[in-house]
Amino acid sequence: MALPNQQTVDYPSFKLVIVGDGGTGKTTFVKRHLTGEFEKKYEPTIGVEVHPLDFFTNCGKIRFYCWDTAGQEKFGGLRDGYYIHGQCAIIMFDVTARLTYKNVPTWHRDLCRVCENIPIVLCGNKVDVKNRQVKAKQVTFHRKKNLQYYEISAKSNYNFEKPFLYLARKLAGDANLHFVESPALAPPEVQIDLAAQQQHEAELAAAASQPLPDDDDDTFE
């Protein structure tokens, strides 16, 4: 099925909707992929930029048509036209801004109201910033809703490919799918050293082993 500004191609392609509060880094994240940035198209009727992001797997090429909100979430909710025919999604929050995480359930609800049973990745962005406000142990929404969670840093390219690989495996129904070459990414604007990466991963592993809180509100101590 061809979507607006989406030509028919002879390899699998999927509409990927990216949602989250304004300023969480959604546009920065998508623009790291240089080919997608070069070939983006604007869809004026809905007010989005559509970025075609190509990845090369052991099963061949796949394309994600990434729908970026162009900042209109700052003026309230998004129109249903943004979500319709969405086949997968990324919900993004900013680990340096607590409110953006508290709003994740609202984005998830709006998304699932239109797109039922699609694979969804929750991404905590800006882990390169030292004084994060949302710690790994406080991120529990994905466990309650059975979503995949990754911590990323758009500006450093840290974990850039992981959300796309997870979604590709889910959409293809193949857990052994893997990328055979890296996409061309913009040079990192910041660096995350190996020790910091290992610390992030250790904190995530520790958080995953903790029991879930009883209440629905994720607490911030």
Curated annotation (Swiss-Prot):
Membrane-spanning segments: none
Region span, Switch-II: 71-87
Small GTPase Ran-type domain span: 10-174
Switch-I as annotated region, ranges: 40-48
Annotated CDD domains: Ran
Family annotation (SUPFAM superfamilies): P-loop containing nucleoside triphosphate hydrolases
SMART domains: RAB (SM00175), RAN (SM00176), RAS (SM00173), RHO (SM00174)
Matching Pfam families: Ras
Chain spans, region Disordered: 201-221
General function of this protein: GTP-binding protein involved in nucleocytoplasmic transport. Required for the import of protein into the nucleus and also for RNA export. Involved in chromatin condensation and control of cell cycle.
Family: Belongs to the small GTPase superfamily. Ran family.
Subunit structure: Found in a nuclear export complex with RanGTP, exportin and pre-miRNA. Interacts with RanBP1a and RanBP1b. Interacts with KPNB1.
Name under which the protein is recorded: GTP-binding nuclear protein Ran-3
